[in-house]
Amino acid sequence: MLERLIAFIDGARTSLDIAIYDAHLDDGAGARVVAALDAAEGRGVQVRAVYNDEHRRPIPVPPPPTGPSTLARLAAAVPSTAIPGIPDLMHNKYMVRDRDTVWTGSTNWTIDSWTGMENVIVVVPSADLATAFTEDFEQLWTRRRVEGSGGFDDDPASIAFDGEPLTVRALFAPGRGRAMGHLVARRIAGARTRLRICSPVLTSGPILSTLAEVLDDNRTDVLVTVDGPQMREVLAQWDRDGRAAWKRPLFERVRASGRLALKPSRPYQAGPPHDYMHAKVVVCDDIALTGSYNLSHSGEMNAENLLEVTSNPFSDACAGFCERVHARYAG
């Protein structure tokens, strides 16, 4: 994973914009990433970074970063802007290279993310998609806050994947956060042959209620995987907060369907290792949705991104990943 990250940075020729939530690497890996960024600047690449400014307020889902942070070294190496993580997180994990290629997904720059967690990275060679991500980055860069970013629509872009046409578009939260949740819910409702879901948690009301209805109707093949300890924490929060208690019966219907797998990850602790189920992927027939957005209510208010990809080969690859993860933790 480190080699892929460095190779992407090394491929930059004119510009590299980075939006990263969490960067906790050991000294060796951190030094190599910083060296790659220094080398990019040395060959004339304009490098910029925005990152989440860590804080002490407890956030059980997602768990807060821990251990030695690489963000300070990143900020010292390249022009950077810290985005306050209060009240909402700068939760993106993307790069835009040369205004024509996007790297995004669920993967932070941490050893745990690379070795202990299920995660997804998508690299899309598309100037049209890069334009949308650049617009989101510019909003974060200039405003220096999560609030007010992502409030625009992106037109679909077309590229080739595995010899077939692929259509992709992006949505960004918080500006389009509610639209993200409703889009995922609509795609779930429309699934006819297969529905595959990997997410740390399921707390979005529209998504959870639609999923429960699809399972009750038994009209498509469904497999769902979430993180066990994180969902238990969510259920405890719902029990304490009467305003969200209506969601518990919906989740119990999902659990009772027999289609749910819970990853028995290590409960949150201050130091490594961390091995959460961290991938964010939804496959509805030939449509795949993936990015940093984790199907949660809070995700609609964070700085997040979501790709909607229409492609049989790409959706097959995402479905295969979800099926392998589900098989690992089912039963």
Where in this protein do the model-derived segments appear?
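Acidic/histidine-rich, surface-exposed loop or edge segments in extracytoplasmic proteins
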Residues: 17-21
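Long, charged amphipathic helices and adjacent flexible linkers at domain junctions
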Residues: 150-159
